[in-house]
Amino acid sequence: MAREGFTLECTSCKMQNYISKKNKKLHPEKVKLSKYCSKCSKHSVHKERK
């Protein structure tokens, strides 16, 4: 199956906050999103992590 699950990790505190899925064939690059981190209590960049 092409769709793969991954977690999003906060770049500030390294906490894994979100779980998501993507199609690896259509989007092979790593995901970077601005999301809210409950540990930092602010919006920060979250990067894809296996």
Curated annotation (Swiss-Prot):
Source superkingdom: Bacteria
Family in the record: Belongs to the bacterial ribosomal protein bL33 family.
Listed HAMAP family: Ribosomal_bL33
Gene: rpmG
Name of the protein described by the UniProt record: Large ribosomal subunit protein bL33
GO biological process: translation
Any one GO MF annotation of this record: structural constituent of ribosome
GO cellular component annotations of the record: cytoplasm; ribonucleoprotein complex; ribosome
Keywords: Ribonucleoprotein, Ribosomal protein
UniProt cross-references to InterPro entries, sorted A to Z: Ribosomal_bL33 (IPR001705), Ribosomal_bL33_sf (IPR038584), Ribosomal_zn-bd (IPR011332)
